[in-house]
């Protein structure tokens, strides 16, 4: 098992990777008012960030295999912090989006490196436990982030961006930890052939499709549409939106905390099927909930779906390859995440503009059905489990 300093770095990187979107969700309506934006235009503050992440994630995976984890991690932390600081001084919406692109360039490597570092530091026996703890810790962060973002947003929409400076002490900590060294000269032909063979496996494709759909169900109807609906329908302030939205993270934390016990009894497919129902059911009635605080129940269930599904998918993807090609495989998975995070906010914003909130949540319901179908038809009852 890794030491305390190693674990602190690991959890710190995971918390930062979850901060880029959840911290600013409560101030999206305030941004829209300040700059006179539509729902789709306001959603670009998420899309620009996640598109930059999606671009950098596969690059970061290969570079960390070739040049070592530190050569990628340290610059990523500095760029991530720098982009957030620049947002504090942005004068126009165009400036905000440019700063978010810069920040996303730094965030891309963080999203894949926390899983790579976990797989480097922890043996296969203990990896599921660590992945569950990483998700639980991340969920604790995402409980706090919307609340902090909402409270700071009462002062100014810019204020939450100051929190991104927490990447700077994490960068200092990374200098004190011994990370995986560069491999030196690589046989690129063998590297890509071996990686390609793994990526073409049915299980691997199933994992990547699942992770795409899971994040689509999160970032479209929940992360993008709910804050805008909360202001339009319930006239909620940034702080109230942040408090209610924190129930997503509470559900995710509790589900992830209990996941190791559930994983010991249930197969991968069973867990994903349960998660699929938890993704689907809240979206069936979220648009018709009569009050803001009653939305906490479907948001909690949606968060539980994340806590049940994402850690075990990441766990299984991390064990697909060898240490030599692990980063490239995880980078493909994280790229699927970032593409989903980029496409779904824009898509669901357009749907909500044309068919209102009922249309957006009905589309999210359809995504949940797809998760159930993939889990049922791609994976066997006792396969794709990290217990193997």
Which residue stretches match the model-derived regions?
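Juxtamembrane intracellular "pre-TM" segments in multi-pass secondary transporters
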Residues: 179-208
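Structural signature of the two symmetry-related core transmembrane helices
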Residues: 72-85, 270-284
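A late C-terminal transmembrane helix in Major Facilitator Superfamily
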Residues: 323-355
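Cytoplasmic helix-loop-helix junction between adjacent transmembrane helices
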Residues: 99-138
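Conserved MFS/SLC helix-loop-helix module at the cytosolic interface between two early adjacent transmembrane helices
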Residues: 55-91
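Helix-loop-helix hairpin linking two adjacent transmembrane segments in secondary transporters
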Residues: 133-176
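Helix-to-loop junctions at the C-terminal end of transmembrane segments
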Residues: 57-68, 255-267
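Helix-breaking motifs and short loop linkers at transmembrane-helix boundaries and internal kinks
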Residues: 36, 68, 89-95, 235, ...
């Amino acid at each position: 098992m890794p030491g305390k300093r190693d674990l602190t770095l690991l959890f710190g990187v995971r918390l930062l990777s979850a901060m880029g979107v959840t911290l600013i969700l409560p101030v999206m309506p305030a941004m829209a008012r300040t700059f006179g934006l539509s729902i789709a235009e306001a959603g670009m503050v998420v899309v620009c960030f996640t598109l930059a992440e999606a671009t950098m994630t596969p690059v970061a995976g290969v570079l960390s295999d070739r040049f070592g984890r530190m050569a990628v991690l340290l610059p990523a932390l500095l760029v991530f912090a720098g982009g957030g600081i620049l947002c504090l001084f942005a004068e126009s919406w165009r400036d905000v989006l440019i700063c978010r692109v810069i920040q996303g360039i730094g965030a891309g490597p963080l999203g894949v490196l926390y899983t790579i570092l976990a797989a480097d530091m922890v043996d296969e026996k203990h990896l599921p436990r660590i992945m569950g703890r990483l998700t639980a810790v991340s969920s604790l962060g995402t409980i706090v982030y919307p609340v902090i973002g909402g409270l700071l947003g009462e002062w100014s929409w810019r204020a939450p961006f100051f929190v991104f400076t927490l990447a700077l002490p994490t960068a200092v900590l990374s200098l004190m930890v011994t990370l995986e060294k560069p491999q030196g000269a690589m046989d690129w032909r063998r590297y890509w052939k071996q990686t390609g063979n793994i990526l073409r496996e049915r299980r691997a494709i199933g994992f990547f499709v699942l992770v795409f759909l899971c994040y689509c169900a999160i970032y479209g109807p929940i992360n993008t549409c709910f804050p805008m609906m909360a202001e339009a329908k319930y006239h909620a302030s940034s702080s109230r939106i942040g408090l209610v939205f924190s129930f997503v993270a509470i559900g995710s934390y509790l589900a992830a905390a209990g996941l190791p016990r559930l994983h010991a009894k249930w197969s991968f497919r069973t867990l994903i099927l349960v998660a699929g129902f938890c993704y689907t059911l809240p979206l069936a009635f979220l648009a018709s909930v009569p009050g803001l605080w009653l939305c906490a129940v479907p948001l909690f269930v949606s968060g539980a779906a994340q806590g049940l599904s994402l850690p075990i998918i990441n766990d299984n993807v991390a064990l697909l390859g060898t240490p030599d090609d692990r980063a490239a495989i995880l980078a493909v998975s994280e790229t699927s995440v970032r593409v989903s995070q980029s496409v779904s906010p824009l898509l669901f914003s357009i749907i909500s503009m044309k068919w209102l909130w009922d249309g957006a949540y009905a589309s999210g319901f359809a995504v949940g059905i797809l998760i159930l179908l993939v889990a049922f038809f791609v994976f066997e009852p006792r396969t794709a489990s990290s217990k193997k």
